[in-house]
Amino acid sequence: MLRRALEEAIAQALKEMGVPVRLKVARAPKDKPGDYGVPLFALAKELRKPPQAIAQELKDRLPLPEFVEEAVPVGGYLNFRLRTEALLREALRPKAPFPRRPGVVLVEHTSVNPNKELHVGHLRNIALGDAIARILAYAGREVLVLNYIDDTGRQAAETLFALRHYGLTWDGKEKYDHFAGRAYVRLHQDPEYERLQPAIEEVLHALERGELREEVNRILLAQMATMHALNARYDLLVWESDIVRAGLLQKALALLEQSPHVFRPREGKYAGALVMDASPVIPGLEDPFFVLLRSNGTATYYAKDIAFQFWKMGILEGLRFRPYENPYYPGLRTSAPEGEAYTPKAEETINVVDVRQSHPQALVRAALALAGYPALAEKAHHLAYETVLLEGRQMSGRKGLAVSVDEVLEEATRRARAIVEEKNPDHPDKEEAARMVALGAIRFSMVKTEPKKQIDFRYQEALSFEGDTGPYVQYAHARAHSILRKAGEWGAPDLSQATPYERALALDLLDFEEAVLEAAEERTPHVLAQYLLDLAASWNAYYNARENGQPATPVLTAPEGLRELRLSLVQSLQRTLATGLDLLGIPAPEVM
């Protein structure tokens, strides 16, 4: 990567100037000289010099790497212009994943209650979690993707109770999770709901004993059909009943009780409970005390989350795993009493949970620190995201106001089919093209925005072939693929024939790896999504460039040598778009 090599050279020169820092090199503004630039304002105080003088001194001291043509001080920046042939060679270099580095990153996402169909709110969780897992793997991390199955929770108990209580019989046609979800909604609308609580409690206890696992699994398998349709990937399923059976909660609480900040008050409102004082880690709390174990001996969900986190990071052991029989994910493993012992011992975790769970996630990190693992607490990340509206409406599964992911997929595919029919009536496989476009529209809309901002999914906007959409990027890929298909094979490119148009496109291609690394480091896919939008726009500008009313960048009819250069650039662009889309879990159609 030329940018990182330039950063290394600058860091070495600054070290010789007495400032051992590494500054980030960024693209220079288009109205300024140079391709890249480094800001030097932050060094003014330490060096007691104006930034302009620092820029000149750095230029004088810096041995320019061979791929840099010149360094130009611009105010408080030092800008760099790359040699065109070096720039082109780097842009044409085949893309490959970064070298693997040690240490497991565990990404937990989806983790939907196994009691009904997935709704629109779950879409963002799945799209974000799956994309960040793919991005991290490409960036050189060993990634494990985990889906947590809360089979001992109240929601699962209520659904199983409702199916029996109302004597509901599945017709074999309706998707089973939708059938189960209707029973759940019916129970919550039942005026006798409060009177039924003791019977629901009996089902809950049966779930805790692991007696109704197959009934829960039936709902889970139906949910997994949706996850598979969304192109999400998983490595492990962890069932809460197995966590209970393995005694992880008791082990975690015993470990925490060794801390002076975890105790059992003898009087006051917390009398008899096991309480954690989070104030040493989370200062400024109005009430720093959090109950882990109630006075009646029942655990709070804080405590369960903490125990699970301790297992993820190798502090506790006790879960066993075996292959999971299902038609969607051949290599998937599930926790089970009869499996083989396994602990991931992750050095870093990312829990994809909506922003409303920020406080519980902070308590998980606090528990790690108070248990004596402050370094692991720093590596326990929460990828928080805001809610999703559908055409301006808020969702509520309990009230039956949610729109299912299956319905969104079906409607988006129906609309995409009409668009494909209109734009390309001779398309060889309209159904597959519609599926790809629909998936691209849905998943891209869920990751293109910064996670902490609310999004409003609207079909017409998301499916547009123009603007900041998945289909816009997919269409750019298909256009590039069409040119390559017509070209057949070609010879070696003549880099010396490059025009400013090729140079500009090559410079944008160089930003791909930087976008991947930034998305991985910041743990947010929207950085990569925005890069793909910018690259697609750059490609469209290149494709449509005109001079004196004539096409300025013809590819197939260009002179020999330049034709090969342009084809090679188009190929690099096509591969970059395809790789980038795949890292977001989106297919790259060859024909649209």
From Swiss-Prot:
Q: Which InterPro entries match?
A: aa-tRNA-synth_I_CS (IPR001412), Arg-tRNA-ligase (IPR001278), Arg-tRNA-synth_N (IPR005148), Arg-tRNA-synth_N_sf (IPR036695), ArgRS_core (IPR035684), DALR_anticod-bd (IPR008909), Rossmann-like_a/b/a_fold (IPR014729), tRNAsynth_Ia_anticodon-bd (IPR009080)
Signal peptide location: none
Domain of life the protein comes from: Bacteria
SMART domains, sorted = Arg_tRNA_synt_N (SM01016), DALR_1 (SM00836)
State any single GO MF term. ATP binding
Q: What are its E.C. numbers?
A: 6.1.1.19
One CC-aspect GO term: cytoplasm
Q: In its UniProt record, which GO terms are filed under biological process?
A: arginyl-tRNA aminoacylation
Which reaction equation describes what this protein catalyses? Answer: tRNA(Arg) + L-arginine + ATP = L-arginyl-tRNA(Arg) + AMP + diphosphate
Q: Where is this motif: 'HIGH' region?
A: 112-122
Instruction: Give the matching CDD domains.
Output: Anticodon_Ia_Arg
Its keywords, alphabetically, are:
Aminoacyl-tRNA synthetase, ATP-binding, Cytoplasm, Ligase, Nucleotide-binding, Protein biosynthesis
**PROSITE patterns under this entry?**
AA_TRNA_LIGASE_I
The UniProt subunit note reads as follows: Monomer.
As for family, the record states:
Belongs to the class-I aminoacyl-tRNA synthetase family.
List the protein's name.
Arginine--tRNA ligase
Please spell out the taxonomic lineage of the organism that makes this protein: Bacteria, Thermotogati, Deinococcota, Deinococci, Thermales
